[in-house]
């Protein structure tokens, strides 16, 4: 359980950046489920 918490956090961080990069690059379609 101790090593699962940080792993899930890393995935969340990566997904946030991944969704942010393409969303802003496309022209901000208005898809911000993380915000």
Swiss-Prot record:
<protein>
    <recommendedName>
        <fullName>Coenzyme PQQ synthesis protein A</fullName>
    </recommendedName>
</protein>
<dbReference type="InterPro" id="IPR011725">
    <property type="entry name" value="PQQ_synth_PqqA"/>
</dbReference>
<comment type="function">
    <text>Required for coenzyme pyrroloquinoline quinone (PQQ) biosynthesis. PQQ is probably formed by cross-linking a specific glutamate to a specific tyrosine residue and excising these residues from the peptide.</text>
</comment>
<comment type="pathway">
    <text>Cofactor biosynthesis; pyrroloquinoline quinone biosynthesis.</text>
</comment>
<dbReference type="Pfam" id="PF08042">
    <property type="entry name" value="PqqA"/>
</dbReference>
<feature type="cross-link" description="Pyrroloquinoline quinone (Glu-Tyr)">
    <location>
        <begin position="16"/>
        <end position="20"/>
    </location>
</feature>
<keyword id="KW-0884">PQQ biosynthesis</keyword>
<dbReference type="GO" id="GO:0018189">
    <property type="term" value="P:pyrroloquinoline quinone biosynthetic process"/>
</dbReference>
<comment type="similarity">
    <text>Belongs to the PqqA family.</text>
</comment>
């Amino acid at each position: 359980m101790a090593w699962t918490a940080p792993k899930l956090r890393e995935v969340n961080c990566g997904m946030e950046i991944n969704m942010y990069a393409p969303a802003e690059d496309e022209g901000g379609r208005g898809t911000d489920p993380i915000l």
